């Protein structure tokens, strides 16, 4: 039994979100939620919401027991990048890259 949840166009770079995703991959969900709640990173809040959604999907759609769930797959892919211009001195301009990512979490039973 598997349940999936996605957050598309999350406003964090994929590189920063992968640091957090690598910490919770393969963990039981209760341990992962505890780790995410104490992490100071912005991506931890985004990933925690997706994990909560995946747990709710497993409970509602599959009737799964929450205590048995494990994060079997978590992947962070790059989303589109918004390019913005920042005016600088002497008529120059810098490009500001506002990156986004797609977070996918799959939870399933241990057995």
From Swiss-Prot:
* Alphabetic keyword roster: Ribonucleoprotein, Ribosomal protein, RNA-binding, rRNA-binding
Q: Which GO terms describe its cellular component?
A: cytosolic large ribosomal subunit
Gene3D superfamilies, per the entry: Ribosomal protein L22/L17
- Please report a single Pfam family linked to this protein: Ribosomal_L22
| Gene Ontology molecular functions | rRNA binding; structural constituent of ribosome
Keyword Lipoprotein assigned to the entry: answer is: no
Q: Does the keyword Metal-binding apply?
A: no
The UniProt entry's GO biological process terms, in alphabetical order, are: translation
Q: How does it assemble?
A: Part of the 50S ribosomal subunit.
Which protein family is named in the record? Belongs to the universal ribosomal protein uL22 family.
Can you say what this protein is called? Large ribosomal subunit protein uL22
Q: Which gene encodes it?
A: rplV
């Amino acid at each position: 039994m598997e349940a999936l949840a996605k957050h598309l166009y999350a406003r964090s770079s994929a590189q920063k979100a992968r640091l957090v995703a690598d910490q919770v991959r393969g963990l039981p969900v209760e341990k992962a939620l505890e780790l995410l709640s104490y992490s100071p990173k912005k991506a931890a809040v985004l990933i925690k919401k997706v994990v909560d959604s995946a747990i709710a999907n497993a409970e509602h759609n599959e009737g799964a027991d929450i205590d048995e769930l494990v994060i079997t797959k978590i992947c962070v892919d790059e989303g589109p990048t918004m390019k913005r211009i920042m005016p600088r001195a002497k008529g120059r301009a810098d490009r500001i890259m506002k990156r986004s990512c797609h977070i996918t979490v799959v939870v399933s039973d241990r057995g």
